[in-house]
Design a protein with these regions (language model features):
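Catalytic Walker B motif of ABC-type/P-loop ATPase nucleotide-binding domains
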Residues: 155-159
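Helix-to-loop junction immediately C-terminal to a conserved catalytic motif
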Residues: 49
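ABC ATPase nucleotide-binding domains
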Residues: 227-254
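Conserved ABC transporter NBD signature motif
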Residues: 56-66
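The feature captures the beta-strand-to-loop junction immediately N-terminal to the Walker
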Residues: 34-36
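Conserved ABC ATPase "signature" region
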Residues: 109-124
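ABC ATPase NBD coupling module
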Residues: 66-80, 85
Length: 254
């Protein structure tokens, strides 16, 4: 296995956000990390990427290298991470934000330009980052991660599709699939289970800080099990997973 997590525990102060997670994944795959709010999804992937600020125990190895003991710079050479909320304090253009990849690992202008094209942000490149919409900002920081990322590396995405319209989601999903096809391992936190079903090869299901299930998409994304875990009824139509929306109209005042 390319990525091996052994007995991972993560704390927020005195509270355990992740408890004893052991799981693995191969390169060339897309792994969706799912679960309800507060289940430990983001804490887990941040710990894997080495950016979680709290205390953590256990080990993470990537291609045989112990990431738990690696320096931030060494880790960044093999692991690129995108947070769910883009934060750029300086007054940069989108192109300058993407070029920040060169502050982590040596990168040429060609790396930056390829990332710009891969995420379809050339029309945004010279605009102020702060003036972009939420979905546009997310695509720009994803392009920065792609500029930093070496094919065959580990890419960790925490809810990357938030604030994106359908066309933006489609563009990013296509880029993620291309990276996996080229040998990268992509971990992606998702709330949209239909998107997880369409995009991922494997699924890690977090529940109350523990790994409830992991394995191939078709076995973990079982409609009956998801209904019990999420409190929402699911069904498969033509092989695709979708939630069943049942109207609940409470009496209105007056």
């Amino acid at each position: 296995m390319s990525l091996v997590i052994d007995s991972m525990c993560v704390w927020h102060g005195a509270r355990a956000a992740v408890q004893g997670v052991s799981v693995s994944a191969r390169a060339g795959r897309i792994v969706a990390v799912i679960g309800r709010n507060g289940s430990g999804k983001s804490s887990l992937v941040r710990a894997i990427a080495g950016v979680h600020p709290g205390r953590r125990t256990g080990s993470t190895s990537w291609r045989g290298r112990d990431l738990s003991a690696a320096s931030a710079l060494d880790r960044a050479r093999g692991v690129a991470y995108v947070a769910q909320r883009p934060l750029v304090a300086a007054d940069f253009t989108a192109r300058e934000v993407i070029a920040l990849a060169g502050a982590v690992v040596p990168r040429t202008t060609e790396h930056v330009e390829r990332a710009i094209d891969a995420l379809g942000v050339r029309d945004l490149a010279d605009r102020p980052f702060a003036a972009l919409s939420g979905g546009e900002q997310q695509r720009v920081v994803l392009a920065r991660a792609l500029a930093q990322h070496d094919l065959g590396g580990l890419l960790v995405l925490d809810e990357p599709f938030n604030a994106m319209d359908l066309a933006e989601q489609h563009r990013v999903a296509g880029a993620v699939q291309c990276l996996a096809s080229a040998g990268s391992l992509v971990l992606v936190v998702l709330h949209d289970l239909a998107l997880a079903d369409a995009l991922a090869h494997e699924v890690w299901w977090m529940d109350a800080g523990r790994l409830r299930a992991s394995g191939p998409r078709e076995s973990v994304l079982d409609a009956a099990a998801l209904g019990q875990g999420f409190g929402v009824r699911f069904e498969r139509v033509g092989g695709s997973l979708r939630p069943v929306i049942a109207p609940r109209c409470e009496p209105l005042p007056g």
